[in-house]
């Protein structure tokens, strides 16, 4: 007989009904407080402090005391969890008009940056890697009352008011991980992950017993399951709670298998640096770090569960769940304010909307038909919280208490009950009424986000203490537009727009690359985040009426740039090869020519190219000087 996918029946048929009394009756309700990465008992909180200072994972700090974690996915955008911000509307997050200021700080020890941000009127300080937020978007599904703000649709994006030019960015995986052929006793599904975040810490036994110190911590784990909260509730408590959205999930294993609260929720063994998440980690990345040649983000942290009244939060036996990015990839692409733009082949004006086309975001990843991690987007929209997710579930839910009295697992991918290591082939009689005790929808789920009980400035000067705790999978993608963020869109002009949430103005920032053959003529004032020219037959002509400002830097790798107006770069102008000419003004900290040619005025034309900054011309570069009549000549004025 086929074993029905009902955990109470599964466990009862395996001859174990006491689990329902010991676990279901002791399941805990939500606690509205926060914690951070917690190591196993073989390590101290100091041991797991991240030794890399700035790595693209940062702390989110609301000036009303809320702490979360986020990940930089481009120089302007951080991805994190909706429940960190969805208690307010987007216009409520502001440094003016009584709004709540928000910042992300990316140093491993974020305290100095956050204190500076508060002390200096909520200003970005790139030297301390702290950035003020000028807009926030969160997924509307997280506002559904049953979601309790974090159980599904828990994804958000923040826009930085200044590009984080020197902070590393992360790639995001928009494909579901493939189900393994089998679940291993030691490695589970076989996917090694890194968990990281800011906030509370402690030990495997004591849980989140140490307060937030604003330092980033990191630990390792095996991915335990791609499955829903309903899968867990059905297995442990006998009935689903109505939470069908798949989540990436991990558990916190006791390396010694002695802790009474650790019943090995997901089949795998503890790793040497095994750790669990806690509050302050909310929104932090689940990093797939060994499956491919590069690390990539699978999801953002929403929350965790504990299963006994006596069990400390974030201790051995607890589990954590992450929102899979593949379910929300199209929402992410749409709400990402950053656009990569390039030109179509042929000559055209910068101001001609038909001259431009959006390029594929270089940080978007999918798994191709060969199983390789490649730059790309899926061919159909994400299922979201309520669509039909066609991903294959994987992982085994287990009840293997430390006293050795039981060994029951359920494979969510194959719908198989496993007793003492063997698939169940028949039914055993329940010792007690299997359906007698269940857990209501939200019990056992612990929200991971922390609100400090004191003013933000005070909490930064001492250890923070917590308060009491429709099927779219087969639908074709729409036509690419600038708004939906799909590559291949046209009908726009690259020129940065700062968001104004109170007026419904959507922010847009551009990274522009000229690679196609043809000349782009700029005769207006334009500001973008970054400019690159890489095509040998590409050219940019800035007329005397034109002005280009790059908020980060300029990479002149090939092709021609003529500046008769002005070109201003916050960062350096790097001339690898190609021609830089003109009679205008170039402003940059450094103009560095490696193998390029600099021709003031232009080849065959006498003129002065002014450089407001430093100029470095290596031995491989060429300075082309024209000599005119009456002693006139080109001038490179530095």
What are the language-model segments listed below?
Residues 343-352, 360-558, 562-565, 569-570, ...:
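Extracellular beta-sheet-rich ligand-binding/adhesion modules
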Residues 152-155, 161-274:
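Chymotrypsin/trypsin-fold serine protease catalytic domain
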Residues 54-56, 66-68, 74, 100, ...:
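Residues that flank catalytic or metal-binding motifs in active/ligand-binding sites
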Residues 37-42, 48-50, 67, 72-86, ...:
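C-terminal subregion of chymotrypsin/trypsin-like serine protease catalytic domains
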Residues 576-638:
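Extracellular beta-strand/loop-rich repeat segments of large surface/secreted proteins
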Residues 38-52, 95-185, 189, 196-201, ...:
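Conserved catalytic-core segment of clan PA serine endopeptidases
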Residues 138-146, 154-170, 226, 273-310, ...:
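Extended amphipathic secondary-structure runs
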Residues 2-79, 87-100, 401-402, 406:
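Protease-domain processing segments flanking chymotrypsin-fold serine proteases, especially trypsin-like
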């Amino acid at each position: 007989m086929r074993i029905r996918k009902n955990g109470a029946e599964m466990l009862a048929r395996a001859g174990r009904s006491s689990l329902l009394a010991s676990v279901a009756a002791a399941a805990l309700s939500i606690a509205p407080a926060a914690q951070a990465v917690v190591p196993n008992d073989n390590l101290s909180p100091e041991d797991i402090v991240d030794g890399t200072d700035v790595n693209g994972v940062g702390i989110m700090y609301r000036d009303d005391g809320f702490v979360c974690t986020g990940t930089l996915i481009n120089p302007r955008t951080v991805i994190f969890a909706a429940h960190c911000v969805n208690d307010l509307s987007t216009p409520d997050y502001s440094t003016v008009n009584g709004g709540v200021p928000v910042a992300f700080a990316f140093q491993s020890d974020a305290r100095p940056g956050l204190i500076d941000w508060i002390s200096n009127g909520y200003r970005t300080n790139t030297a301390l890697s702290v950035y003020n937020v000028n807009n926030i978007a969160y997924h509307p599904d997280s506002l559904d009352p049953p979601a309790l703000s974090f159980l599904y649709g828990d994804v958000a994006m923040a826009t930085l008011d200044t590009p984080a030019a020197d902070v590393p960015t992360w790639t995001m995986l928009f494909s579901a991980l493939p189900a393994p052929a089998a679940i291993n006793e030691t490695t589970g599904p076989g996917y090694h992950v890194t968990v990281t975040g800011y906030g509370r810490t402690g030990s495997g036994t004591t849980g989140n017993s140490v307060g937030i110190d604003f330092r980033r911590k990191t630990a390792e784990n095996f991915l335990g399951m791609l499955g829903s909260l309903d899968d867990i509730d059905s297995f442990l408590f006998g009935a689903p709670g109505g939470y069908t959205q798949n989540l990436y999930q991990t558990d916190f294993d006791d390396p010694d298998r002695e802790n009474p609260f650790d019943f090995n929720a997901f089949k795998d063994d503890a790793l040497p640096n095994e750790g669990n998440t806690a509050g302050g980690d909310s929104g932090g990345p689940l990093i797939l770090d060994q499956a491919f040649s590069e690390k990539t983000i699978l999801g953002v942290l929403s929350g965790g569960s504990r299963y006994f009244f006596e069990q400390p939060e974030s201790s051995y036996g607890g589990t954590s769940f992450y929102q899979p990015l593949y379910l929300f990839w199209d929402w992410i692409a749409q709400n990402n304010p950053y656009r990569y733009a390039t030109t179509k082949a042929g000559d055209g004006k910068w101001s001609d909307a038909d001259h431009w086309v959006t390029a594929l975001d270089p940080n978007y990843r999918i798994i191709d038909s060969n199983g390789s991690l490649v730059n790309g987007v899926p061919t159909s929209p994400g299922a979201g919280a309520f669509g039909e997710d066609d991903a294959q579930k994987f992982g085994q839910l287990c009840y293997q208490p430390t006293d050795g009295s039981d060994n029951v697992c359920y494979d969510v991918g194959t719908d198989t009950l496993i007793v003492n290591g063997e698939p169940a082939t028949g039914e055993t009689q329940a010792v007690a009424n299997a359906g007698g005790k269940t857990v209501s929808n939200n019990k056992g789920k612990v929200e991971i986000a922390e609100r400090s009980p004191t003013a933000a400035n005070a909490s930064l000067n001492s250890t923070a203490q917590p308060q009491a705790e429709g099927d779219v999978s087969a639908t074709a993608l729409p036509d690419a537009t600038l708004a939906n963020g799909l590559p291949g869109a046209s009908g726009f002009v690259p020129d940065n727009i700062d968001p104004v949430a109170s007026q419904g103005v959507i922010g847009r920032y551009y990274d522009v690359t000229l690679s196609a053959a043809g000349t782009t003529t700029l005769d207006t004032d334009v500001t973008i985040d970054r400019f690159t020219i890489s095509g040998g037959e590409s050219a940019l002509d800035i007329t005397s009426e034109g002005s280009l400002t790059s908020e980060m830097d300029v990479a002149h790798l090939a092709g021609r740039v003529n500046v008769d107006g002005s070109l201003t770069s916050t960062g350096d102008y790097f001339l690898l090869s190609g021609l830089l000419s003109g009679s205008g003004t170039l402003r940059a900290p450094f103009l560095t020519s490696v193998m390029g040619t600099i021709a003031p005025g232009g080849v065959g034309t006498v003129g002065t190219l002014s450089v407001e900054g430093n100029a470095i011309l290596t031995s491989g570069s060429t300075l082309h000087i024209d000599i005119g009549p009456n002693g006139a000549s080109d001038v490179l004025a530095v």
